[in-house]
C-alpha cells in the first residue's frame, strides 16, 4: 500500500475523496479525507499485545489546528494547547459508534488520531474525521467489525437535509448527528426546537440511509487496499473455573442484587464477592494473582447476567421498580440566599444542585476555535465530585465526561433561553452533582430549569430530561425508564431524552451492542415522552413560572438606543467620557455597534443616573424647543448657555431682551439659570438661542419705535485681505 490511491464519491452535493497509501504509512491504517475544502488526516494504531486490565483501552483524539482556518492561536505561547471543549466533544462523538464494534474480550490498545488540516465551514470536519476513523480501522490489520459512518441531519420547512451548510443550519429546527453500520444505528446526538418524537425518528432514519451508502463506499476501499486482520487472542474465562465460581456464588448473588437501596445492595454484592475471593486466597495457588483477577471478572459477569435475567425475564429491576417506573421525585428552589437563582432536584438517589448566575453581556464566553461562532452568552457547566458516589480521590480539571454532560444540558436548554433583545444577560448555569445513582446529567437539566425560574429568567418553557435503558437478550428486549447506575453499567443502551411538554430539545444515545432497529428507537422515544411529562408535572408544581423580579443581588440591566454616530461622544477621547460615567455611578456599560447601550448595576438608582447622563450627551436640540440652562461663559456679543451636558448655545446680546441691552452683564451673570428658546441650528451644528422670545413684548408709542438692528450671532472670522 505504498502507492497513493484515491477513492471518490459525492456527499451532500460536495466531492468526498479518500486518499490512502501516501501519508502516515507507519500507522496500522491511515486515510486522508477531503470533503469540499475540508481536509482531515486520521491514523489508527493497535498494539501487538494485550494491555493489563479488564477493559478495552481505546483512545480517540481529535486535534484542531488553528492554521486550518487561517488563525494564529491566542495566548502567550501562540501554539495549540489543551483540546477545546469542541475538540473533546468531537473525540467522544467518534469514540461512541466505534467502541461497540470491537469484540468482547479485546484488550489490545487502540489509538485513533484525527488531525484537522483545512476547514471549509460548510463541510463538517467532525463528520470527515468520523469517516476517516472508520476507514483507517477497516483498511488496517486491527480486528474491527465496521465500517461505520456518521452524518449530520437538519430539517428546513419540513424537509430533511444531509450535512446542512452554515446558512441551512441556522434555519433548521433539528441539529442531529447520527452514526451506525449498514444494518443499524448505534449513536445519536441531537439538539432540536421542540420537535415531535415522530419527526426526530424520521430524521434518524433519513440519516441512516446516507450511512448505508457511505458504508458501501468503504467496502470498495476495503476490497482494494484492506489488510488481512491479525489474529488476536481475546480474553476468555477458563470454563472450569467459571462453572466452579458460578456454582458457589450464583444463588447468593441473586439475593444480593434484589436489595433495593443502592449502598445496601453494593455492600451485599461486595460481601458475596469477598467471600468467594477469600476462599481462593486460602488455597494458596501458584498463580494466585492471575486466578484472583479472573475470579473477580467472573463474579462481575455473574452479577451482570443476573441483573439482565431479572429485568428481561421477571420484568423486575434491582430496586423493585417496574420497567417504566420513575424513582421518587423531590425539588426545591431558592436554597442559596445570595445567588441569583438555585434549584435542587432529587430523583431517587441522584441529586443535583443547579445555580443560575446573571451577568452583563460583556461577560460572555469568547470562542476561539475552528467554527464561525465568536461568543456565547449561555453556558451550562456540570461538576461530578467523587463524594457523590461515596468515593475518595484527587479532584482534577473537568474531564471528557463532565464536559460532555455539561454540553448535553446546554443543548437541552438552549432553545428555551430568551433572546438577547428580550433578556440582555449572560446566563451561566452550574450543576453540582451531590449524589449519583444514574441519570445525573438529566437531573442537572431539571435542576437548571428550576434555577432559571428561581432567577427570573423568562424561559419559553420548562425542560426536563430522562435517561432510558435497554436489556436485549436475543430478539427479546426490555426498555427501562429512568435507569440507575447498575442498569447503565450492565445494560445495552443509555438513551437520554430532554424536552418540554411540546417536544424534544436534546437527545443522546449510546449503545454497547451492534445497533438498534427502528422499532426499538420508536418505543424508547414514546416511553421517554411519558416519563418526561411526568417529571415536568413535578417541576411545575414546585415553581410554575419565572419570578417576576430578579434577585436583589443580580445586576439590573437597562437598555438605551442611541444613534451610531453618537457612540464616539459617549465614549469620549481615549474613553475619558465613558470612564467618567462608570466612576461616577459604579455601573457597567456595554455599547454595541448598532447603538444599543446596556447599563448594568445592582443599584437601580445608579442605572437611572447613568441613563440620564448618556441621554444628555446624545441629546440633540430641536428648533422651537425651550430649555433651562446655566450661563457658562460671557462675551461682549452674548452669553453661552449650557442646555444639557455637552451641549451649549449662544444667546446673542440682541436676543436677551426686547429693549436695547448695553452690556450682557446687565441681564445675565456667570452661573445664572436662564430659560431660553432654540431659534436656529446652523449648518455647522451651532445653536442660537433667544431669551426675549419667551418674554412679553412691551408696547411702545408709535413715535418711539426704532428700526431693529440686524441680528448677529456667532461672530464670523474676517477673511485675510489679499495683498
UniProtKB/Swiss-Prot annotation:
Root EC class: transferase
Q: Which residues form the S1 motif domain?
A: 624-692
Where does it live in the cell? Cytoplasm
> Do you know which InterPro entries this protein is assigned to?
ExoRNase_PH_dom1, ExoRNase_PH_dom2, ExoRNase_PH_dom2_sf, KH_dom, KH_dom_type_1, KH_dom_type_1_sf, NA-bd_OB-fold, PNPase
User: Which keywords does this chain's UniProt record carry?
Assistant: Cytoplasm, Magnesium, Metal-binding, Nucleotidyltransferase, RNA-binding, Transferase
Reaction equations catalysed: RNA(n+1) + phosphate = RNA(n) + a ribonucleoside 5'-diphosphate
Where does the chain bind Mg(2+)? 488, 494
Molecular function (GO) terms for this protein are: 3'-5'-RNA exonuclease activity; magnesium ion binding; polyribonucleotide nucleotidyltransferase activity; RNA binding
SMART domains hit by this protein? KH, S1
Documented EC number(s): 2.7.7.8
Main subcellular location of this protein, as a coarse class: cytoplasm
- List every stretch annotated Disordered: 692-723
* Ranges of biased composition (kind: Basic and acidic residues): 693-723
Q: What does the sequence similarity comment in the record state about its family?
A: Belongs to the polyribonucleotide nucleotidyltransferase family.
According to its UniProt entry, what is the function of this protein?
Involved in mRNA degradation. Catalyzes the phosphorolysis of single-stranded polyribonucleotides processively in the 3'- to 5'-direction.
Q: Which HAMAP family match?
A: PNPase
Q: How is this protein named in the record?
A: Polyribonucleotide nucleotidyltransferase
Organism name: Listeria welshimeri serovar 6b (strain ATCC 35897 / DSM 20650 / CCUG 15529 / CIP 8149 / NCTC 11857 / SLCC 5334 / V8)
Encoding gene, per UniProt annotation: pnp
Amino acid at each position: 500500500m505504498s502507492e497513493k490511491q484515491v477513492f471518490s464519491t459525492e456527499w451532500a452535493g460536495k466531492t468526498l475523496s479518500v486518499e490512502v497509501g501516501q501519508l502516515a504509512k507507519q500507522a496500522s491504517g491511515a486515510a486522508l479525507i477531503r470533503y469540499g475544502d475540508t481536509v482531515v488526516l486520521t491514523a489508527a494504531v493497535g498494539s501487538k499485545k494485550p494491555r493489563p486490565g479488564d477493559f478495552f483501552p481505546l483512545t480517540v483524539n481529535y486535534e484542531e489546528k488553528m492554521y486550518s482556518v487561517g488563525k494564529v492561536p491566542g495566548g502567550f505561547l501562540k501554539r495549540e494547547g489543551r483540546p477545546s471543549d469542541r475538540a473533546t466533544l468531537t473525540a467522544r462523538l467518534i469514540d461512541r459508534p466505534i467502541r461497540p464494534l470491537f469484540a468482547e474480550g479485546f484488550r489490545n490498545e487502540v489509538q485513533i488520531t484525527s488531525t484537522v488540516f483545512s476547514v471549509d465551514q460548510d463541510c463538517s470536519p467532525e463528520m470527515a474525521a468520523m469517516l476517516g476513523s472508520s476507514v483507517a480501522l477497516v483498511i488496517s490489520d486491527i480486528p474491527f467489525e465496521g465500517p461505520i459512518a456518521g452524518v449530520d441531519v437538519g430539517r428546513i420547512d419540513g424537509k430533511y437535509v444531509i450535512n446542512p451548510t452554515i446558512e441551512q443550519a441556522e434555519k433548521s429546527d433539528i441539529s442531529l448527528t447520527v452514526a451506525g453500520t449498514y444494518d443499524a444505528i448505534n449513536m445519536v446526538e441531537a439538539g432540536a426546537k421542540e420537535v415531535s418524537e415522530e419527526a426526530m425518528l424520521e430524521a434518524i432514519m433519513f440519516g441512516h440511509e446516507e450511512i448505508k451508502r457511505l458504508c458501501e463506499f468503504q467496502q470498495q476501499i476495503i476490497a482494494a487496499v484492506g489488510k488481512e486482520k491479525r489474529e488476536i487472542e481475546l480474553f476468555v474465562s477458563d470454563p472450569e473455573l467459571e462453572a466452579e465460581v458460578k456454582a458457589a456464588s450464583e444463588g447468593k448473588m441473586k439475593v444480593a442484587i434484589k436489595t433495593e437501596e443502592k449502598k445496601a445492595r453494593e455492600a451485599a454484592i461486595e460481601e458475596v464477592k469477598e467471600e468467594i475471593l477469600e476462599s481462593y486466597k486460602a488455597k494458596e495457588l501458584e498463580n494466585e494473582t492471575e486466578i484472583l483477577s479472573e475470579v473477580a471478572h467472573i463474579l462481575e459477569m455473574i452479577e451482570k447476567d443476573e441483573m439482565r435475567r431479572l429485568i428481561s425475564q421477571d420484568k423486575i429491576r434491582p430496586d423493585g421498580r417496574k420497567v417504566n417506573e420513575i424513582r421518587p421525585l423531590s425539588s426545591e428552589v431558592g436554597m442559596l440566599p445570595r445567588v441569583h437563582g438555585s434549584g435542587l432536584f432529587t430523583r431517587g438517589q441522584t441529586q443535583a444542585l443547579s445555580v443560575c448566575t446573571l451577568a452583563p453581556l460583556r461577560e460572555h464566553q469568547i470562542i476561539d476555535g475552528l467554527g464561525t461562532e465568536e461568543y456565547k452568552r449561555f453556558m451550562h457547566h456540570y461538576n461530578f465530585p467523587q463524594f457523590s458516589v461515596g468515593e475518595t480521590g484527587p479532584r482534577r480539571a473537568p474531564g471528557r465526561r463532565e464536559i460532555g454532560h455539561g454540553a448535553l444540558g446546554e443543548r437541552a436548554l438552549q432553545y428555551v433561553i430568551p433572546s438577547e433583545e428580550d433578556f440582555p444577560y449572560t446566563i451561566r448555569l452550574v450543576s453540582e452533582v451531590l449524589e449519583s445513582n444514574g441519570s445525573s446529567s438529566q437531573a442537572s437539566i431539571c435542576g437548571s430549569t428550576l434555577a432559571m425560574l428561581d432567577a427570573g429568567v423568562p424561559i419559553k418553557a420548562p425542560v426536563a430530561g430522562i435517561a432510558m435503558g435497554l436489556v436485549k437478550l436475543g430478539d427479546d428486549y426490555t426498555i427501562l425508564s429512568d435507569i440507575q447506575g447498575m442498569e447503565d453499567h450492565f445494560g445495552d443502551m443509555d438513551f437520554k431524552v430532554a424536552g418540554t411538554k411540546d417536544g424534544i430539545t436534546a437527545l443522546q444515545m449510546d449503545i454497547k451492542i451492534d445497533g438498534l432497529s427502528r422499532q426499538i428507537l420508536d418505543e424508547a422515544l414514546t416511553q421517554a415522552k411519558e416519563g418526561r411529562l411526568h417529571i415536568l408535572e413535578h417541576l411545575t408544581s414546585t415553581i410554575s413560572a419565572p419570578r417576576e423580579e430578579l434577585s436583589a443581588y443580580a445586576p439590573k440591566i437597562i437598555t438605551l438606543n442611541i444613534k451610531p454616530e453618537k457612540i464616539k461622544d459617549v465614549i469620549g477621547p481615549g474613553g475619558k467620557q465613558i470612564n467618567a460615567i462608570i466612576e461616577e455611578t459604579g455601573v457597567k456599560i456595554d455599547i454595541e455597534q448598532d447603538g444599543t447601550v446596556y447599563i448594568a448595576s445592582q443599584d437601580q438608582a445608579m442605572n437611572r443616573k447613568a441613563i440620564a447622563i448618556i441621554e444628555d450627551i446624545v441629546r440633540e436640540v430641536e428648533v422651537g424647543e425651550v430649555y433651562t440652562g446655566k450661563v457658562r461663559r460671557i462675551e461682549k456679543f452674548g452669553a453661552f448657555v449650557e442646555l444639557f451636558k455637552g451641549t451649549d448655545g449662544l444667546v446673542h446680546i440682541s436676543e436677551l431682551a426686547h429693549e436695547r441691552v448695553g452690556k450682557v452683564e446687565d441681564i445675565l451673570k456667570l452661573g445664572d439659570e436662564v430659560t431660553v428658546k432654540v431659534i436656529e441650528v446652523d449648518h455647522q451644528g451651532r445653536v442660537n438661542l433667544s431669551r426675549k422670545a419667551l418674554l412679553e413684548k412691551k408696547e411702545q408709542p408709535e413715535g418711539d419705535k426704532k428700526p431693529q438692528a440686524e441680528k448677529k450671532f456667532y461672530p464670523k472670522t474676517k477673511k485675510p485681505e489679499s495683498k
